[in-house]
């Protein structure tokens, strides 16, 4: 469990929130964190799909009270279709609301080595690139917080051994083959983990190290709600990474469209991606279209500010109107 302890370092500073389900993984992580004197609270989503849902909620509340922790419960609306994707969105929206309201610095999740292998195999079968194959990271920076997955190199069998005297609940949906992940688990991942777990751990460590070398640190700046960085051969990787930090995951077809459009398009009617000769920009699309005055348009044009960014900048300009607003933005690009 040395890898586990290494990944706890960030949790020693700031407030922490554990995503808790009452299942094997999050229960083990709960007690491992308690054993390491990590301070945290817990958050649970009730999807109203489990027979034991009320017992799970009561158990979570009792556990939190016993260990002097806050316990947040969210009762999700009924999910009619695409359960896994909708459940994930509900879960992360709930976590991010709590993080914002209570100033949590870290979101702790109980993903383990088996989860990572299942994801890897699923993406491999789709024809994914390195960034998507390795999208599960032990430490993942988001805009206002970081996701920490201390168990990412820990096999599920290790957790089963640790949990032999602990109370936890089995989720019936984990055995349902109508979910693709469960098919990959049953048909491929389980047997690979049973026979080759040590080699799989080492391979993921090598791949993580090589990913860091392939995608070196890129300086990212932000001004007036626009995130930007210098264009390089890793530009698509950076766009994917930044959008993920903002809570949006690009599909393969969207990535292809970004390349075809030379980094100048809208994504999901929500994000603007734009570029000039040297930079790539990412911004939230303004909620409403504003009519820009001619002098603002002219100044933006003379400064070679890309067209898609002008409405974003104008919306920000209205909040803090100064005569050198656009000039300072242009200067920030030159200073990058």
From Swiss-Prot:
Location(s), subcellular: Cytoplasm
GO biological process: one example: tRNA modification
GO molecular function: ATP binding; tRNA(Ile)-lysidine synthase activity
Main location: cytoplasm
A Pfam entry, by short name: ATP_bind_3
Origin superkingdom: Bacteria
SUPFAM superfamilies given in the database record: Adenine nucleotide alpha hydrolases-like (SSF52402)
Catalytic activity: cytidine(34) in tRNA(Ile2) + L-lysine + ATP = lysidine(34) in tRNA(Ile2) + AMP + diphosphate + H(+)
Keywords: ATP-binding, Cytoplasm, Ligase, Nucleotide-binding, tRNA processing
EC number(s) from the headed UniProt entry: 6.3.4.19
Entry GO terms, CC: cytoplasm
Binding site for ATP: 21-26
PANTHER family: TRNA(ILE)-LYSIDINE SYNTHASE-RELATED
Record text about domains: The N-terminal region contains the highly conserved SGGXDS motif, predicted to be a P-loop motif involved in ATP binding.
UniProt family annotation: Belongs to the tRNA(Ile)-lysidine synthase family.
Role: Ligates lysine onto the cytidine present at position 34 of the AUA codon-specific tRNA(Ile) that contains the anticodon CAU, in an ATP-dependent manner. Cytidine is converted to lysidine, thus changing the amino acid specificity of the tRNA from methionine to isoleucine.
Protein name per Swiss-Prot or TrEMBL: tRNA(Ile)-lysidine synthase
Source organism of the structure: Helicobacter pylori (strain ATCC 700392 / 26695)
Higher taxonomy: Bacteria, Pseudomonadati, Campylobacterota, Epsilonproteobacteria, Campylobacterales
């Amino acid at each position: 469990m040395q890898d586990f302890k290494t990944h706890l370092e960030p949790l020693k500073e700031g407030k922490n929130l554990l995503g808790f389900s009452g299942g094997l993984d999050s229960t083990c992580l709960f007690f491992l964190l308690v054993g390491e004197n990590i301070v945290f609270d817990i958050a649970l989503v009730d999807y109203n799909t489990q027979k034991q849902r009320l017992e799970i909620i009561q158990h979570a509340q009792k556990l939190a009270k016993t260990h002097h922790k806050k316990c947040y419960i969210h009762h999700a609306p009924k999910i009619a279709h695409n359960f896994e994707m909708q459940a994930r969105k509900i879960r992360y929206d709930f976590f991010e609301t709590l993080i914002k309201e209570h100033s949590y610095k870290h979101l702790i999740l109980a993903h383990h080595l088996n989860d990572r292998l299942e994801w890897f195999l699923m993406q491999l079968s789709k024809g994914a690139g390195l960034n998507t194959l390795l999208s599960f990271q032990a430490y993942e920076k988001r805009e206002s917080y970081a996701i920490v997955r201390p168990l990412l190199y820990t096999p599920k069998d290790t957790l089963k051994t640790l949990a032999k005297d602990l109370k936890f609940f089995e989720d019936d949906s984990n055995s349902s083959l109508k979910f693709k992940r469960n098919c990959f688990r049953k048909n491929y991942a389980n047997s690979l983990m049973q026979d080759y777990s040590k080699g799989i751990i080492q391979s993921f460590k090598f791949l993580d190290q090589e990913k860091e070398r392939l995608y070196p640190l890129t300086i990212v700046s932000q001004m007036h709600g626009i995130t930007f960085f210098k264009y390089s051969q890793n530009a698509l990787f950076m766009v994917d990474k930044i959008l993920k930090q903002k809570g949006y995951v690009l599909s393969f077809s969207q990535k292809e469209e970004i390349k075809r459009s030379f980094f100048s398009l809208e994504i999901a009617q929500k994000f603007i991606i734009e570029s000039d000769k040297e930079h790539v920009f990412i911004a939230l699309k303004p909620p409403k279209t504003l009519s820009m005055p001619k002098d603002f348009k002219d100044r933006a044009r003379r400064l070679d500010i890309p067209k898609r960014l002008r409405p974003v900048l104008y919306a920000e300009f209205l909040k803090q109107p100064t005569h050198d607003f656009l000039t300072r933005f242009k200067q920030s690009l030159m200073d990058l």
